[in-house]
Amino acid sequence: MKGTKKKTPCNKKLGGYLKEQKGRLYIIRRCVVMLICWHD
């Protein structure tokens, strides 16, 4: 299983996708926090 990491060129694509998802999650979380604070 160790050798499969080197062979996959889609690893970079996956990393970028994960980064994008992380950023989106962060934005959504901030919006939720702002909404909760705003309700109080």
Swiss-Prot record:
Tissue specificity remark: Mostly expressed in flowers and stems, and, to a lower extent, in roots and leaves.
UniProt KW Membrane keyword: yes
Protein name as catalogued: Small polypeptide DEVIL 3
Localization of this protein: Cell membrane
GO aspect biological process, one term: shoot system development
Protein purpose: Small polypeptide acting as a regulatory molecule which coordinates cellular responses required for differentiation, growth and development, including leaves shape, pedicule elongation, inflorescence organization and fruit maturation, probably by restricting polar cell proliferation in lateral organs and coordinating socket cell recruitment and differentiation at trichome sites.
Primary site of residence: membrane
Regions crossing the membrane: 12-28
Region (Required for DVL/RTFL small polypeptide activity): 9-40
Mode of membrane association: Single-pass membrane protein
Keyword presence, Membrane: yes
Family, as annotated: Belongs to the DVL/RTFL small polypeptides family.
Cystine connections: none
Xref: InterPro entries: DVL, DVL/RTFL_small_peptides
Keywords: Cell membrane, Developmental protein, Membrane, Transmembrane, Transmembrane helix
A cellular-component GO term for this protein: plasma membrane
Coiled coil: none
Domain of life: Eukaryota
